[in-house]
Amino acid sequence: MDKIKMTTPLVEMDGDEMTRILWADIKELLLTPYIDLNTEYYDLGLRHRDDTNDKVTWDAAYATKKYGVAVKCATITPNAQRVEEYNLKEMWKSPNGTVRAVLDGTVFRSPIIVDGISALVPTWTSPIVIARHAYGDVYRDVETYVEQGDKAEIVVSGKDGEKKRIEIFDFEKSAGVVLGMHNTDKSIESFARSCFNYALDVKLDLWFATKDTISKTYDHRFKDIFNDIFNAEYKDKFAAAGIEYFYTLIDDAVARVIRSHGGMIWACKNYDGDVMSDMVATAFGSLAMMTSVLVSPDGAYEYEAAHGTVTRHYYKYLKGEETSTNSVATIFAWTGALKKRGQLDGNKELENFAEKLEKATVKTIENGYMTKDLAGMFHKDGVTVRPQNSRGFLEKIRETFDNM
């Protein structure tokens, strides 16, 4: 059988622990037998990041900007315990944070729907994609404790030397806490364009929600920028694609989403997206059944699983014990990247392969073959659940793929 050829390389970012093991198995069993895989490889494993003083992460991010499509394995973001465990030179920053900073991207997370794994919200029959703005707000805040009798103010020092002072609160009767947070027009504009472009790419309605009735300057700025960019650049494109852009308040959005059948992109500010993405993931089944793609406003895509490195299973693996680690999200990271590479290069054969592998993965589960984490939540009349170990599950997917 002739392997599928690739004309443009895919940026491949390897990772850590159990997901690194699955990464190699996926390539061996599901990809290289069928594709003449063309990747520009970067080892983002923690030891290699340390060896290169994290230069490899920056190189991978800029390669993604150059080639337009990347696939990333889950990686360790070191804390103090990891610094000691790996004898690191320093506590390196999150690789995801570095890639986001270079691409100025927005993270889109979407559940993988399987017949037999029901959403906890019965009406949710189609995926809900969460688009989370990954910059600023409370995640880049400054905050302090305030003594009784103190007064808190915002001071804005103008470039002309003038200062604008706004009182936040006079803590005359009690001590308390205060924080300051920010965002930038540039970042909000990038967020908006990423959301509009992705909605056009996947042909889904886009919802955006803030609390502009209460936050009449901060949240209203988000609303205005989205509205201005939509009307100036995307209104006609959305109409041609048969999709809609819809703005509402965040509390109304929550109520609408719960009542909906799904099938939309829900764009959220940073904190809202952090909370709602976990809520949606849990309601649909698990983080191991969520896709994640980082999209830059200039059209670069980085695909990855929405979960971590599965440390507990990795330590079992090192002891020679059997593991049953869910690889579905990592498989879909590969298929998402291959599909996008195929679309950009006009390589229909590669695109069709990726779609077929996704269908084979879902069909394998629907036929009763799955990892142990899914076994307890899968219920389908006439289907017997047969839990598989990590590699056995991938072998079953290959068997399904070959018989399709």
Short names for language-model regions:
Residues 2-8, 18, 22-23, 28-52, ...:
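N-terminal alpha-helical transmembrane segments of multi-pass membrane transport
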Residues 6-25, 154-248:
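Glycine-rich phosphate/diphosphate-binding loop of Rossmann-like nucleotide-binding domains
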Residues 35-41, 202-210, 234-247, 342-354, ...:
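Flexible, glycine/charged-enriched surface loops at secondary-structure junctions
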Residues 46-60, 223-264:
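N-terminal small/polar loop signature for handling phosphorylated ligands or for N-terminal nucleophile
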Residues 47-164, 271-275:
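N-terminal glycine-rich phosphate/adenylate-binding segment common to multiple enzyme folds
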Residues 257-356, 363-367:
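Glycine-rich phosphate/nucleotide-binding loop
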Residues 319-325, 343-404:
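Internal helix-turn-beta structural module
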